[in-house]
């Protein structure tokens, strides 16, 4: 479960999000929709622990992001156009990202790719992937 309590984010003097409160139950898929500049990406970054709030808190499974844990290990975001290093294979991209999270098991990376129907042994560079393949790689991430 993810709980948002009085979440506010201010950049310089501009308030992007103000006093957001919500609860997201575990096991469900949620989406965020809104106009350009509404703060959707900022909210998602806050929910994953990729950014810290100016005020308020995000609680994931009873643990406060930024206090009890630095990031939400079981949460992720898939953006419309995922960004990967185009000159590396899908496996190499995931390996680079996994090293940031101290995941060194090649088997875990290969399993994540297989779950989204991508071949971990393929040497095909991500720059040659279709948008759908890049989005599936984003899910594996």
Please annotate each region the language model reported:
Residues 33-35:
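The feature captures the beta-strand-to-loop junction immediately N-terminal to the Walker
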Residues 139:
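Hydrophobic anchor residue at the start of the ABC signature
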Residues 56-71:
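Conserved ABC transporter NBD signature motif
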Residues 14-15, 69:
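Short coil-to-beta microelement around the adenine-binding A-loop and adjacent beta1/P-loop entry
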Residues 95, 106-121:
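Conserved ABC ATPase "signature" region
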Residues 48:
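Helix-to-loop junction immediately C-terminal to a conserved catalytic motif
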